Amino acid sequence: MSGNHNQSLERALEIVDLAAEAGADALKIQTYTADTMTIDKNDGEFFIEDKKSLWKGESLYSLYQKAYTPWEWHQAIFQRCKEKGIIGFSTPFDFSSVDFLEELDVPFYKIASFENVDLPLIKKVAQTGKPIIASTGMASLAELGELVSTARENGCMDLTLLKCTSSY
């Protein structure tokens, strides 16, 4: 779903309904806040100046504020998924989001491309004992090896790697 809900819970639930009607087996959301992703700064590496970018003139912080799925919506979204017969799950971006998702008893986790080298996060997720789907992104073969060994050494025996594009 990503930020396609445009900060509307009604729209988020409609996306779940439409995904189910279209025959989807699962629906993934992302669990983070602007504060857990970056700092509130409007210059340097935290500000988008690329003239070709859709987000030119935006700070990363403001983009994350616009795109995040409010944590208080997660339960309603996952409940709607259950009602519609599809699996709701999420991509965590930090320890607090893993802890929160564990409270909601998500069935498995997705690791984003840019987090596939965050070995402390991989370890934390693997220690839940739940399956992990990890995007390969731009990771090297050595980095993917570290991801796999970290996941396995910390309890994840059901690991799927997805080849994906990291630049759109």
Please describe what each predicted stretch is:
Residues 4-5, 34-38, 66-67, 116-117, ...:
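Short, small-residue-enriched loops and turns at beta-alpha junctions
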Residues 7, 25-68:
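Glycine-rich, proline-tolerant flexible connector loops at the mouths of alpha/beta enzymes
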Residues 19, 101, 135, 161:
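Conserved, mostly hydrophobic/aromatic
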Residues 23-25, 82-88, 105-107, 128-130, ...:
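Short, well-ordered coil/turn segments that N-cap beta-strands
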Residues 27-29, 88-91, 109-111, 132-134, ...:
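Hydrophobic faces of well-ordered beta-strands that scaffold small-molecule active sites
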Residues 51-119, 141:
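Active-site beta->alpha loop and helix N-cap motifs at the rims of alpha/beta catalytic domains
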